[in-house]
């Protein structure tokens, strides 16, 4: 029995002589054994907390823009393509709503509020296929959506892809690009957007079996299936190559939104064969150039069977349930693209020339001439920058060395005849 003045541990009651160390304070004492016990309890608590933190809840409390809000934001950056914007806005909204629901269900504290019946419903992923001519805005739409939602974005060209084991990029390289875009934050990458362009260029070479392996056509389509529907990709760290005894980064693609796009040149003919009767004789329907529907109008009627005839495999089409067709841009739309969006080309050049202390002006006739040139080149909006760049090359070379240059005027002759812009 300890005497009244013998110091005791305030928690276990042991005397100083019974423990290695007793730390004294004004009103209480604690021994080394109780300190070790408390340390173990805190460590166990931290481990439990870490288990809960493995559940990604980044979308649970995030405000998701409605389809109308997404469409309105797209209008600020992309001209025209109203039908495609609407389809994209709905598909993207449903995709991230699905992500929000799955994260809420994974969070134990929320499960009770949702109910057992709802918890049994599994929402499928709605990947997107964009069909439209070169320069119609497919890539820009995908990039803009990723920026608006603040999610990582990666882009790949389907023509560079080959089956794993062959020279070229394999499908896992696309996931690696997304991981790099998210600074190797796996949870961020798993919620990103991947855009695969030129998907039409990997169509099957034909229905007849071939003795040579089609490693960049149907083979790549087969390889893309798992990525699109959801798989766990093993990615080497920091962009290196895989090798034995290497620790790989596991990335689940189940929640990555996949958007694929292509020009699909000739698809309009496939659709026309399906939708219009053709024949020879007195009662045959004769179609002429004047009354035939435009290619973009036919693309609006695309059906999965048309894509199968074009050369995409049915399994791939089945994993791309959202089809959106973009129309070819006319001259008026190209002029709007030059001037109206937030990052319009004319605004960009005005900013560049402002930094040199000069104000650049494009006449209406100059803008029309730029649009006409782009139409003639059949490059759509993609060709606008090169036309303006060529017209202003000499001016941008000379201007930084000129003193007191205040205005630069670009008129129709500058675009069509290569005349030097007026500088005053």
Curated annotation (Swiss-Prot):
<keyword id="KW-0067">ATP-binding</keyword>
<dbReference type="GO" id="GO:0005524">
    <property type="term" value="F:ATP binding"/>
</dbReference>
<dbReference type="InterPro" id="IPR004487">
    <property type="entry name" value="Clp_protease_ATP-bd_su_ClpX"/>
</dbReference>
<dbReference type="InterPro" id="IPR019489">
    <property type="entry name" value="Clp_ATPase_C"/>
</dbReference>
<dbReference type="GO" id="GO:0008270">
    <property type="term" value="F:zinc ion binding"/>
</dbReference>
<feature type="binding site">
    <location>
        <begin position="133"/>
        <end position="140"/>
    </location>
    <ligand>
        <name>ATP</name>
    </ligand>
</feature>
<dbReference type="GO" id="GO:0046983">
    <property type="term" value="F:protein dimerization activity"/>
</dbReference>
<comment type="subunit">
    <text>Component of the ClpX-ClpP complex. Forms a hexameric ring that, in the presence of ATP, binds to fourteen ClpP subunits assembled into a disk-like structure with a central cavity, resembling the structure of eukaryotic proteasomes.</text>
</comment>
<feature type="binding site">
    <location>
        <position position="31"/>
    </location>
    <ligand>
        <name>Zn(2+)</name>
    </ligand>
</feature>
<keyword id="KW-0143">Chaperone</keyword>
<dbReference type="InterPro" id="IPR050052">
    <property type="entry name" value="ATP-dep_Clp_protease_ClpX"/>
</dbReference>
<dbReference type="GO" id="GO:0009376">
    <property type="term" value="C:HslUV protease complex"/>
</dbReference>
<keyword id="KW-0479">Metal-binding</keyword>
<dbReference type="Pfam" id="PF06689">
    <property type="entry name" value="zf-C4_ClpX"/>
</dbReference>
<dbReference type="InterPro" id="IPR003593">
    <property type="entry name" value="AAA+_ATPase"/>
</dbReference>
<feature type="binding site">
    <location>
        <position position="34"/>
    </location>
    <ligand>
        <name>Zn(2+)</name>
    </ligand>
</feature>
<dbReference type="GO" id="GO:0140662">
    <property type="term" value="F:ATP-dependent protein folding chaperone"/>
</dbReference>
<dbReference type="InterPro" id="IPR038366">
    <property type="entry name" value="Znf_CppX_C4_sf"/>
</dbReference>
<dbReference type="InterPro" id="IPR010603">
    <property type="entry name" value="Znf_CppX_C4"/>
</dbReference>
<dbReference type="Pfam" id="PF07724">
    <property type="entry name" value="AAA_2"/>
</dbReference>
<dbReference type="Pfam" id="PF10431">
    <property type="entry name" value="ClpB_D2-small"/>
</dbReference>
<dbReference type="InterPro" id="IPR046425">
    <property type="entry name" value="ClpX_bact"/>
</dbReference>
<feature type="binding site">
    <location>
        <position position="12"/>
    </location>
    <ligand>
        <name>Zn(2+)</name>
    </ligand>
</feature>
<dbReference type="GO" id="GO:0051603">
    <property type="term" value="P:proteolysis involved in protein catabolic process"/>
</dbReference>
<feature type="domain" description="ClpX-type ZB">
    <location>
        <begin position="1"/>
        <end position="50"/>
    </location>
</feature>
<comment type="function">
    <text>ATP-dependent specificity component of the Clp protease. It directs the protease to specific substrates. Can perform chaperone functions in the absence of ClpP.</text>
</comment>
<comment type="similarity">
    <text>Belongs to the ClpX chaperone family.</text>
</comment>
<dbReference type="GO" id="GO:0051082">
    <property type="term" value="F:unfolded protein binding"/>
</dbReference>
<dbReference type="InterPro" id="IPR027417">
    <property type="entry name" value="P-loop_NTPase"/>
</dbReference>
<keyword id="KW-0547">Nucleotide-binding</keyword>
<protein>
    <recommendedName>
        <fullName>ATP-dependent Clp protease ATP-binding subunit ClpX</fullName>
    </recommendedName>
</protein>
<feature type="binding site">
    <location>
        <position position="9"/>
    </location>
    <ligand>
        <name>Zn(2+)</name>
    </ligand>
</feature>
<dbReference type="GO" id="GO:0016887">
    <property type="term" value="F:ATP hydrolysis activity"/>
</dbReference>
<dbReference type="GO" id="GO:0051301">
    <property type="term" value="P:cell division"/>
</dbReference>
<keyword id="KW-0862">Zinc</keyword>
<dbReference type="InterPro" id="IPR003959">
    <property type="entry name" value="ATPase_AAA_core"/>
</dbReference>
């Amino acid at each position: 029995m300890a005497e009244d003045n013998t110091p005791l541990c305030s928690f276990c009651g042991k005397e100083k002589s019974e423990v290695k160390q007793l730390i004294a304070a004004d009103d209480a004492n604690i021994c080394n054994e109780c300190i070790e016990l408390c340390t173990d309890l805190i460590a166990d608590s931290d481990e439990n907390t870490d288990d809960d933190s493995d559940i990604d809840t980044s979308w649970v409390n995030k405000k998701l823009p409605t389809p109308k809000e997404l469409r309105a934001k797209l209008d600020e950056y992309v001209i025209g393509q109203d039908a495609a914007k609407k389809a994209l806005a709905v598909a993207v909204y449903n995709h991230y709503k699905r992500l929000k629901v799955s994260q809420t269900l994974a969070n134990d504290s929320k499960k009770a509020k949702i109910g057992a019946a709802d918890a049994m419903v599994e929402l499928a992923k709605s990947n997107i296929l964009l069909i439209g001519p070169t320069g119609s805005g497919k890539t820009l739409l995908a990039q803009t959506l990723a920026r608006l939602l603040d999610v990582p974005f990666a882009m790949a060209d389907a023509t560079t892809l080959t089956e794993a084991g062959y020279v070229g990029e394999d499908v896992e390289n696309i996931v690696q690009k997304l991981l790099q875009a998210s600074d190797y934050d796996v949870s961020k990458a798993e919620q990103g957007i991947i855009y695969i362009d030129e998907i039409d260029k990997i169509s099957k070479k034909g229905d007849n079996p071939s003795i040579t392996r089609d490693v960049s056509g149907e083979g790549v389509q087969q390889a893309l299936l798992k990525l699109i529907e959801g798989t766990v990709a093993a990615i080497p760290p920091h962009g290196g190559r895989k090798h034995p005894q290497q620790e790989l980064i596991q990335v689940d693609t189940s929640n990555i939104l996949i958007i694929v796009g292509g020009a699909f040149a000739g698809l309009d003919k496939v659709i026309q064969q399906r939708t219009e009767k053709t024949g020879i004789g007195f009662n045959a329907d004769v179609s002429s150039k004047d009354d035939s529907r435009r290619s973009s109008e036919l693309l609006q009627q695309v059906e999965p069977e048309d894509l199968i005839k074009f050369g995409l495999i049915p399994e791939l089409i089945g994993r791309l349930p959202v089809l959106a067709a973009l129309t070819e841009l006319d001259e008026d739309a190209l002029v709007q693209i030059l001037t109206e969006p937030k990052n319009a080309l004319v605004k960009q050049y005005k900013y560049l020339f402002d930094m040199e202390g000069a104000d650049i002006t494009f006449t209406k006739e100059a803008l029309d001439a730029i649009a006409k040139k782009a139409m003639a080149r059949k490059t759509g909006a993609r060709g606008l920058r090169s036309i303006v760049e060529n017209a202003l090359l000499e001016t941008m070379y000379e201007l930084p060395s000129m003193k007191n240059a205040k205005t630069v005027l670009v008129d129709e002759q500058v675009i069509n005849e290569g005349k030097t812009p007026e500088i005053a």
